[in-house]
Regions:
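Proteostasis/folding factors centered on peptidyl-prolyl cis-trans isomerases
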Residues: 1-10, 37, 61-94
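Well-structured core secondary-structure elements of compact alpha/beta domains
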Residues: 1-26, 42-57, 87-94
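Glycine-centered tight-turn and secondary-structure capping sites
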Residues: 25-32, 72
Length: 94
């Protein structure tokens, strides 16, 4: 079974996610630093690292994004019932 490893940050608004993504992809801000500074998720303290997980362990929109990404890619903002996420895929394993 394929597993992925991802880091994420969680914010309240799409606009905040868009602005953070722009800074991250332009190299102005490291993903882990952004997560530590602004994420509403407790994982922010670890740079947003969620570790490895399989399909069925995360909410569907989040999971769908993770399993369609390439390693080191930063997602567009993803909305879930928790808020707006940016995801950075950090690994894949079989």
């Amino acid at each position: 079974m394929t597993k992925v490893r991802a880091s994420h940050l969680l914010v309240k608004t799409e606009q905040e996610a868009i602005e953070l993504r722009e800074k991250i992809v332009n190299g102005e801000l490291a993903f882990a630093d952004a997560a530590a500074m602004v994420s509403l998720c407790p994982s922010g303290a670890n740079g947003g690292d969620l570790g490895f997980f399989c399909k069925g362990q995360m909410v569907k929109p989040f999971e769908d994004a993770c399993f369609s990404m390439e390693v080191d890619e930063v997602s567009q903002p993803i909305q879930t019932q928790f808020g707006w996420h940016l995801i950075q895929l950090t690994g894949k394993a079989d």
